[in-house]
Amino acid sequence: MASKFDLHSLVANWQNSSATAKAHWSGTFDEYLDIVKANPKVTRNAYQRMFDMIVEEGTEVYIDFKKEVVRYKFFDDKFNNGKDAVFGLDVQLMKLVNVLKAAALGYGTEKRVILLHGPVGSAKSTICRMLKKGLERYSYSDTGALYTFEWVDEKLELDGLLGKGVKVFPTPMNEEPLLLIPDDLRASVFEQLNKGQEGTYRVNVDGELSPPSRYIFKALMEKYDGDLMRVFKHVRVKRLFLSEADRVGIGTFQPKDEKNQDSTELTGDINYRKIAEYGSDSDPRAFNFDGEFNIANRGLIEFVEVLKLDVAFLYDLLGASQEHRVKPKKFAQTHIDEVIIGHTNEPEYRRLQDNEFMEALRDRTVKIDIPYITRWRDEVNIYKRDFNSQKVRGISIAPHTVEMAAMWAILTRLEKPKKANLTRLQKLKLYNGKTLPNYTEDNVRELRKETQREGLEGISARYIQDKLSNALVAAQQSNKGSVNPFMVFKELESGLKSHSLISDEEVKAEYRELLGVVMQEYEEIIKAEVQRAISADESAMQRLCGNYIDNVKAYTQKERVRNQFTGNDEEPDERLMRSIEEKIEIPESRKDDFRREIMNYIGALALEGKKFNYKMNERLHKAIELKLFEDQKDSIKLTTLVSNVADKDTQEKIDVVKTRLIKDFGYDEISATDVLHYVASIFARGDVKSK
């Protein structure tokens, strides 16, 4: 019999944990000063805290086409199992973190709006969501701890200063407790707190209290004849935990119909119920400081589609960024400490550039382009996260299905190369790290530099995800058991007819043409895999390669070759060498160059104490495979699959090939059978050679 679920012990352990105890810590102002003295980082401003949050997750430095790139592991989203992980934007994220670093050090970017700019579906919202979730998590950690305060009147001795019958009045904008120290006293207090400190950040809190706290502070100072220590007796400091759901330290603002939206959503509004209690609509206690700017204090405010906002809101944004102040109705400018980040799509940004009245906003923004991914393997990672065997149950996804969809997406985003002899597909492969003849890393860097808008146009990842989902559902409904690239190609093409963001018929025609390029590439891939499965006899390949190398060595050194069977010395077998070289289109005029290249490569390996293997040379490897395939394909009679007439011996050989496809290339029974039938139809047409 299964044991009962013991919730009580789990709750007891949770409540007794040190983390829970720290989470509910509260103390006096003096106790808080001791905390600050021991750890000045608790007083960091919003930019400093966000920068540290990202960096503390770790970094990885790598070289991308001779350029050093820092990858910030924070954006791997490991705490959420990679659900929001950002792929392929390391350079752009590095720029974002550099902006945050400059702001953290007070170099000026803390007075700017960070504007993420890019096409729809390019991860702008995802980046903001990760920053918000990260701040929530960080505020619960020891390294990310921050504090605020509340006013207390346990004995109700303040004559309703905090409100009728109110014993606890939380400061509405989550201010830093050190703001309670009067301006003319701060320098000496901070000097004492910073004595002996050698860290990056020193205690240097800027700003002032929110209007309600300033009102209460002044009233208490008057009541106690300026005795600050007695005022502090009514202050209780507590840990502050940021939460978007609870509207604490994290705010989100998005445009709506301008008739139903006004600036009070940003800066708060009068609490008419409280006016009767306090007698005036200008009493700060009768005002709800719950606008997005107010509640986001100490953290982050995200402006969704920021450039769609009415101009009236943009004035609030200008003051908030440059001066770190907002103007609630009937109150003085109020200090805020928060990261201001917005994002926008291309059409709205062009409007900003064309509008002379928006010049002030342009001057106060730091634009960071967040384009579509242009590296194939990164795009594949996006789809593998959602379309894998763990998430997709009851139906298989054939090898290359996701990869081919990703390839098409990348091709639509790449600009046509200016070099006439370079195709977009070759450009994609170069960006993906593949080497091509006559192209160095410097050439690839030049390719990137010559582009104007690469990654800012094309098909979004969302469209691909939608069509992959459609193909999966259609396959499940028809009981096909497996989704293959051709099913996805069909969905991708049919979806173009009604694509909401592409109205230009020429662009649609171009994208269809690129889909044809991807289909051709897929055919080449599966032809090569079937050929390799047929010629997958490792010992036969090694024998053939050894025979070829022996003959090439003799040819280049003008020697004879010992015949293994007769023992006689013979001339190099020109027919054998050419039958292999022709498979990779080495012309007669270049055979000597190719053979010398192979021998030089083998010689260079020998100097390093390494032994040559045919797999080390991609072109020779391919040639050996194709030669062996040609020698064996007639015995397997793959084309009998087309006519569905195969004798027992042939079927057994075909089953061996299918088993190799499953074992070596990741196919299952259904997809392996489908691929064999399709490749057999290609071979039946006589199209055997792989490019």
Where are these regions (language model features)?
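N-terminal accessory segments that target, anchor, or regulate ATP-driven/P-loop NTPase machines
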Residues: 1-57, 118-121
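Conserved ASCE/P-loop NTPase catalytic core
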Residues: 40-691
